[in-house]
Amino acid sequence: TATMSAATQPETLTSDARYVCLDLLGAGAYGHVYRGMDRSTGTAVAIKIVELDMSTEELNAVQKEIHILSQVQCPFVTRMYDSFVVGMQLWIVMELCVGGSCADHARQGRLNEAHIAVILRDVLRALVYLHAEDMVHRDIKAANVLLYMDQHGTGIRVADFGVAGRLQQAHAKCERAFVGTPYWMSPEVIKQSSYNTKADIWSTGIMAIELAEGEPPYADLHPMKVLHLIPRNPPPQLSPTYSSAFRDFVAQCLTRDPAKRPTAAALLKHKFIRHAGSAVSILTPLAQQYKPLKHSASSQYAAAQTTDPPPLWEFASLRR
């Protein structure tokens, strides 16, 4: 567990406060996240705390996250329970996922194709829901896919809507915002051409490679170099050591032309996904053996860094 600094110490609450912060889990693009407790029920929760001395752009991004999460009703997306201001801090109370992120497990080399197929299936189910609601996540990556365990079983939740956006009819279902994390960005996002939900599909393909190999393509390069290479180079491919079905799934996700890139609903019918097994039987052992790494930067909602310097490729989500 990371050590709390004075800057990240939660505001002191009265003795009758409903929620209490316990240990620091990680730091995301807009705030710190703690393991906490709902004292009215004894339920463990995640509490994201955002300092309010921030720019209007940053505060608007956080408010967008709250607004979007409050509307989402999907079993494959993290649930938000409450939000309020404490002193000069905004507290966002949400579901605690105790099984670690898929980035944690991928970096430890624990994932085989059976694990990956189940994870991708549930990510696609989340995207089907979000895209039907005219939402684009725009930062799909393994650090934002969390494993959970509860009395009903084990599964995954797609997290971190800090940069997600609702598409508006007035914008012809297209946006020109430059957001996301460089290694997972689609060519059209980097070029800042109009794009839609298909940007999430490209990121899903990159994440599939990350799950298999422990890191995304170009992980050894500086993020600015990656932003130059992705639009110019051929799409990344999996090595022949993986099954043909898995390689074809990745290739379809990484179709360069977004108009020809399949939808999340279409990808759910892909052979690699159709043959995925039971989430409970396949993911439960993973979640049970999870132990946070000392230098792990991806606990709950950790997309940027912890108190330890992150590996180069864990580049903070760009905001502009």
Explain the meaning of each model-derived region.
Residues 119-120:
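Activation segment signature within eukaryotic-like protein kinase domains
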Residues 44, 49-73:
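Conserved N-lobe beta3->alphaC-helix segment of eukaryotic protein kinase catalytic domains
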Residues 125-135:
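Protein kinase catalytic-loop region centered on the HRD/HxD motif
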Residues 32:
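Conserved N-lobe ATP-binding subsite of Hanks-type protein kinase domains
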Residues 83:
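Activation-segment/catalytic-loop signature of the eukaryotic protein kinase fold
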